[in-house]
Amino acid sequence: MAMSCKDGKLGCLDNGKYVRYTPEQVEALERLYHDCPKPSSIRRQQLIRECPILSNIEPKQIKVWFQNRRCREKQRKEASRLQAVNRKLTAMNKLLMEENDRLQKQVSQLVHENSYFRQHTPNPSLPAKDTSCESVVTSGQHQLASQNPQRDASPAGLLSIAEETLAEFLSKATGTAVEWVQMPGMKPGPDSIGIIAISHGCTGVAARACGLVGLEPTRVAEIVKDRPSWFRECRAVEVMNVLPTANGGTVELLYMQLYAPTTLAPPRDFWLLRYTSVLEDGSLVVCERSLKSTQNGPSMPLVQNFVRAEMLSSGYLIRPCDGGGSIIHIVDHMDLEACSVPEVLRPLYESPKVLAQKTTMAALRQLKQIAQEVTQTNSSVNGWGRRPAALRALSQRLSRGFNEAVNGFTDEGWSVIGDSMDDVTITVNSSPDKLMGLNLTFANGFAPVSNVVLCAKASMLLQNVPPAILLRFLREHRSEWADNNIDAYLAAAVKVGPCSARVGGFGGQVILPLAHTIEHEEFMEVIKLEGLGHSPEDAIVPRDIFLLQLCSGMDENAVGTCAELIFAPIDASFADDAPLLPSGFRIIPLDSAKEVSSPNRTLDLASALEIGSAGTKASTDQSGNSTCARSVMTIAFEFGIESHMQEHVASMARQYVRGIISSVQRVALALSPSHISSQVGLRTPLGTPEAQTLARWICQSYRGYMGVELLKSNSDGNESILKNLWHHTDAIICCSMKALPVFTFANQAGLDMLETTLVALQDISLEKIFDDNGRKTLCSEFPQIMQQGFACLQGGICLSSMGRPVSYERAVAWKVLNEEENAHCICFVFINWSFV
């Protein structure tokens, strides 16, 4: 069938002739198309009856017109998409060419430097005379030749500091004033966040990023200036003074405070000058630096309990792209006064990788996130009907509330009770601002049940356990550390009416996904704890408890990433302004070392998957798989209480946090690679023979019972059998032959289906993954499995450890026999499984 012409005025018939439509008919059809792009046959006949102007057109012609119109719309969208991709590739190519030019200059500079120059030349001020490596955007920018110009607090003096800051920043952003090296673990490519680099051998710590974002330069500048919206550690930025400049820019004096990430370190503050200007090529620049007394500029008195840190010339170079969007260069360069913290925490303040993750890349991610939301049609609604901006606001409130609890600033109403030297610190807050937000929803006749907020917090050092692994375990196995009665008590503070706990009860946990960022480095979800509480208006029917939960840092391969699990009880109404009392965990890596064995395994089979025949890891990419040798975990729990119960709740909270610490230490020990290796008793680096033997038993037993091979490509080598079994597309899971069978092994597909890890697998029993029908079927088939040796199960539904339903086409269960023909375990294979 031939297509119509582009103007939409021709329709085609089966005999090859075209029908010409009048402009009025085309206009009417276009209106109908916008209302219903794909009408049914009945709807098309109805359209002809409703529009007299279309009465002389046959229904088949109308059908063809709509087909052609949809085709043109699809072609238009595809052409628009290809144009956007082409613009993006052009901009990225330009960015890469500039980066290549900068690297060539850096190489040239390094080649011409000799050892005498390095040893005898005093370290010059950063970029004042970097004319040999002038960047592509500094043409027309006059570098300051004076080493110590006379300045004061006058507008002229501040402008002099601002111009010097601009020159220094540009030489870092696109020049060679700082020796940049690629961020470990970052793989450049069209799908990467951008080009990320960290400093090597400079004063303080520095990080640099450049990338393409789909926002106009002015919008980009507006976002990056609003630092608290994307930098989670930023407590406040106060603009103390604004001075316009002759070139249309502005000079601002800022006072900025940062939260301390842990209870073991004091918070930081900065006294800054920020300069916003437009370069000759149209680029927009926002640059900043600390103001010091040596500059004779305005000063800011030191603030009690804060450590005054220094920001060296940093900022954002924002250049417009042809066809829309911007290319942005980001530089963060700070001296965080690492000497003011305990020695064990100093890597946190001396690592450029940490600075890159929490500051530089956070800004770039925020820009890309907002750009994606802008491009979505009508700012599409997602996450339980919430728009992206509303969900971002909720995540910011969770993070900010947790930071407030960890820091406990006195100017926010927090005060320490009891012994401040105790392992668990107890603080209370009865300020009106805190309570007003807490009791926001008490408008249904119930009196507010809380007039004090109590926080129990502590920090602990962890050895040899990756933060991402530990945090994933805490998320997936809440029952290992949480007390359900405490969960119900926490929820009572934010319910629309009083709610009490069901003592001794344990409900199910269901995780409901809510939203995630572009790169999935952070996601928000709702935890539904079923039947943990009840309310006085209906004391018989159990109430569900909902927790709003924020997770980040779950990527094991990310370098310098802080892992967080922050949650807060939330009312079922889930209002945007719902009161939140955040609690949770923060795990910060302190240093990294190459892992000698992977912690992501069980006590038997997984060891061999991670250890090769020469004692090295099977994976060839070892650069990203480094485990954190040390990390610091901070725990904070907030309780809404009545003032007369303060001492009682403080004692309870202290014991609760101590219990959590004990649970975390136990879990961390179990996840530690050294502990696993000692328990397994590895005598050689060749992998566990038990693992390879079990894989062989599984395949031999399947072949003996079913008469066919389990694996498509079988090999005589045990190691090949093991790897093929591990990478099999169907879920293969083994369980013990006990009164209450528990899982002992699963291949990668099995772990994905159960949404668990190899370490946590043994906490899941067989009956937990089946619904009622599945359990009945299993009970009826179990005797056949034991007598006949195998059974074929019909397709059905099972549940992951997260409570998500999983459908499977069919399943096979069989006994796994050892060398003596004795039953070792039962193995299941779930064929063609998928999440419902």
UniProtKB/Swiss-Prot annotation:
Expression across tissues is: Highly expressed the developing vascular elements and the adaxial portion of cotyledons. Expressed in developing ovules, stamens and carpels. Expressed in procambium and shoot meristem.
Show where the START domain sits: 151-379
Query: Which superkingdom?
Result: Eukaryota
Q: Name one GO molecular function term.
A: DNA binding
Quote the subcellular location field of this record.
Answer: Nucleus
Q: What does this protein do?
A: Probable transcription factor involved in the regulation of meristem development to promote lateral organ formation. May regulates procambial and vascular tissue formation or maintenance, and vascular development in inflorescence stems.
Name of the protein in question: Homeobox-leucine zipper protein ATHB-15
Protein source organism? Arabidopsis thaliana (Mouse-ear cress)
Gene of origin? Answer: ATHB-15
